[in-house]
């Protein structure tokens, strides 16, 4: 919108409307609300003859309180003047209004010109019989009754309207997009009026349908499909608990999940007193209740089923015994379980003892620590080892109260107290013997002196001698 108050004829160029305001404008107080009508290319006539129009020299008349003040609008050299032939017309569109001053309530204490929209449209040749007419939107005698602004509108011919409201070119089609997203805007514009002369009032902007809330998933694929990395939706867990497929661990986990098995019962039964095997030969096979022995394990050559728990061969003990020829306290007939390994002459009275011993040869360690994954051949060794992790010390010393995790450690510690006790007991006996040897000759001398003293004192000696004699 353009707002102006003028008292004199003001020459204004078109470029001046677009860029800057002339310095000759100044406000005039107490002016009535005017009405402005612009006829740049039309002819005067019709029911608005009483209004001011454009003169032949291109002047625009603005009606201000009944006075006629022409306004020069010289066109620049690049535009053809109005008197030029009408094979090519230039149409200027604009809206002018004058803001009256409100006492104490206006944001603009002085009237100024505000250019809201102005444009030069070119390229439409109207027919010779086409005329332009104008009408004022407010027909009330007092324009201020409807509002503070007086709006001047213009009416153009049918071809000009077609040029003004021609739809913009459609956007370029995008690959992968359907026609539902972008539709032709001309379908939403109302068709222009069919009459050659019409009055255009302010029309609201056309209403466009809202876009679809949900888009086709095939339009813009945000996440590409990688069948090599992610499984198909039908293979995924419906609850979302299962993640993408992972490669299997290269090392087998069975050794970590499943504990090593114990010695099978069939192996233990092979070394019981059930009798010699069918393949046992030799003179010593039936004597002394001997169990099955491997070839070369004794004086008699015996052929029997080798001991192979989990196909583990029997290996000789590399560390020799501390006392190889030490006689056992238990007689031989009470130790019916000999060791089947070559070069080992151990015998046991219980089968579980033989089983523990055979693990020394085979290297079988069925007991595993779940904390450090260390394996042991005996369960008691595993029990004492676990105490190193837990810090448990169930064995306490009877003398000092010190605690130990193993009973043999407490036993070694107790021997220290026993040796100290022996030393303490031997020290008083030696000191007592030394005192007795030193007090022997001294006691006789004291007795002699005492006797001498008593002899010296006659009546005391006779008294004592009298009392001692019956």
From Swiss-Prot:
The modification N6-acetyllysine is found at residue 247. Residues 281-291, 440-450 have a biased composition (Gly residues). The keyword Manganese does not apply. Residues 126-153, 159-178, 184-211, 275-344, 408-470 are annotated as: Disordered. GO terms for biological process: aorta development; brain segmentation; facial nerve structural organization; fat cell differentiation; gene expression; learning or memory; motor neuron axon guidance; myelination. Ubiquitinated by WWP2 leading to proteasomal degradation. Acetylated at Lys-247. May be deacetylated by HDAC6, HDAC10 or SIRT1. A zinc finger (C2H2-type) spans 337-361, 367-389, 395-417. Pathway: Protein modification; protein sumoylation. GO terms for molecular function: chromatin binding; DNA binding; DNA-binding transcription activator activity, RNA polymerase II-specific; DNA-binding transcription factor activity; DNA-binding transcription factor activity, RNA polymerase II-specific; HMG box domain binding; RNA polymerase II cis-regulatory region sequence-specific DNA binding; RNA polymerase II-specific DNA-binding transcription factor binding. Pfam families: DUF3446 (PF11928), zf-C2H2 (PF00096). Sequence-specific DNA-binding transcription factor. Plays a role in hindbrain segmentation by regulating the expression of a subset of homeobox containing genes and in Schwann cell myelination by regulating the expression of genes involved in the formation and maintenance of myelin. Binds to two EGR2-consensus sites EGR2A (5'-CTGTAGGAG-3') and EGR2B (5'-ATGTAGGTG-3') in the HOXB3 enhancer and promotes HOXB3 transcriptional activation. Binds to specific DNA sites located in the promoter region of HOXA4, HOXB2 and ERBB2. Interacts with HCFC1. Interacts with WWP2. Interacts with UBC9. Interacts with CITED1. Interacts (via phosphorylated form) with SFN. This is E3 SUMO-protein ligase EGR2. It comes from Rattus norvegicus.
